[in-house]
Amino acid sequence: MKLELSRVVQGCRLGVLTGLGKSGQHSLEVPGCLLHTRCATVPHLTQDTLLTLSDLPAVTQVSVDSLAEHHEVLEEFKEGVRKFAGLHDTVIFCSLHDSASPSPAGHVTNKTVSVWGSGGRIELTAARFMSIQAAVQPDCYQSMADGETWQANTSRKRVRKAVDRTLAHLDECLVLHQKTQELKHAEIFGVVEGGDILEERLRSARETAKRPVGGFVLDGFHSSAMDQDVRAQLIQETSAELPQEKPRLVLGVGRPDEVISCVEAGVDLFESFFPFQVTERGCALSFNYTIDPDPETAGTSASTVLECNGETPEVKKPSANEDVENMTPFEINLKDKRYRDDFRPLVEGCVCYCCQKHMRAYVHHLLVTNELLAGVLLMLHNMAHYLGFFKALRDAITSDRLQDFKNTVLHRRQGD
């Protein structure tokens, strides 16, 4: 696995991650995202339905928390999760947690970490963690880590302990990795911890970079962890300590504005759990990412964000409705009664199956009647929109129009 950078513009790294998979024939453009799954399946979508989407990421993300409870089945199968789940020809990346469902804190020791499955907490030693990786047979995977120091009130002593534990876990995983035949072609990603303390972030990055890892996972930067400006500064200074030729994956960052900020700070890869979260709220991604819109569709039905009438996007204030409370300024709530008689596509000009075949009113009907098809159509649209956003981001960096792209995504909107 090798990261070949073609451009570095104002901190943004444009390139291709090559040599992926056992055959080394796969590649992934950066900045880019992994394909988020639960139990090795994209939520709401069958494999055939998923493959109707274009520009799917070459790397599929699975997580230990969704596989740990029944990994004995994978051990008996002996051919890994890719074949077990009937996945297409893809590269498997195995993370520790599913960022779409934050885990309870307070269950990490010097020797163990905990993940949460459907049956509750599962405590993992390094040996058990590596036995799960051997059963999954990923192409690359995240090392064990103590990632519970993202809270604002975490003491410096606790953060230092988390960095020490994470480095110790990495060393133990590296030893077991060398002894595991099923992982002889796999790459291990070291985890950079340190909370919001720059000194510990730098120490974690420097020490992790000394180990024989294939890439780096930047943990503890998810949306609720810290202010966006603080996150960007920490990532930028931490990234300066990491080798240029190895990829950097940030966990827990999915909102378009946060993705752009992290790309400017030097991040290469992201997860794609955000479209799933939007789908679960009964919402559709509707933000505009086209710098030069098609003149035939421009002005007919502008892509809107919370129907905000051109206002700069802000997170909605908490309300009694949990779905509305968690909404971001990049989506529309199709459960809202205003869409009952709205016969337009979810986003004008979108080429996804949902927008080509159906209208807002129909998806609204499916949602209020609790039809399973609602999740299928929304997931198809949201994934297509999110993947289109990343492609447009790469194109903007290529053409030196990142600022125009940011203005388009964050500010240049008109109300419906």
From Swiss-Prot:
Q: Which GO terms describe its cellular component?
A: cytoplasm; mitochondrial outer membrane; mitochondrion
What is a GO molecular function of this protein? protein homodimerization activity
Superkingdom assignment = Eukaryota
The processes (GO biological process) annotated in the record are:
tRNA-guanine transglycosylation
* Broad class of where this protein is predominantly found: cytoplasm
Q: Where in the cell is it found?
A: Cytoplasm; Mitochondrion outer membrane
* Keywords of this entry: Cytoplasm, Membrane, Metal-binding, Mitochondrion, Mitochondrion outer membrane, tRNA processing, Zinc
A single Pfam family, by name? TGT
Membrane topology per the entry is: Peripheral membrane protein
InterPro entries to which the protein is assigned, alphabetical: QTRTD1, Queuine_tRNA-ribosyltrfase, TGT-like_sf, tRNA_ribo_trans-like
Known cofactor(s): Zn(2+)
Instruction: Establish whether keyword Cytoplasm is in the entry.
Output: yes
Cofactor binding annotation: Binds 1 zinc ion per subunit.
* Binding residues annotated for Zn(2+), in chain numbering: 350, 352, 355, 381
Q: Does the keyword Transport apply?
A: no
Report the NCBIfam families cross-referenced here: tgt_general
Record text on subunit structure and interactions: Heterodimer of a catalytic subunit qtrt1 and an accessory subunit qtrt2.
Protein's job: Non-catalytic subunit of the queuine tRNA-ribosyltransferase (TGT) that catalyzes the base-exchange of a guanine (G) residue with queuine (Q) at position 34 (anticodon wobble position) in tRNAs with GU(N) anticodons (tRNA-Asp, -Asn, -His and -Tyr), resulting in the hypermodified nucleoside queuosine (7-(((4,5-cis-dihydroxy-2-cyclopenten-1-yl)amino)methyl)-7-deazaguanosine).
Q: What family classification does the UniProt entry report for this protein?
A: Belongs to the queuine tRNA-ribosyltransferase family. QTRT2 subfamily.
Entry-linked PANTHER family: QUEUINE TRNA-RIBOSYLTRANSFERASE ACCESSORY SUBUNIT 2
Q: What is this protein called?
A: Queuine tRNA-ribosyltransferase accessory subunit 2
Origin species:
Danio rerio
Name the gene: qtrt2
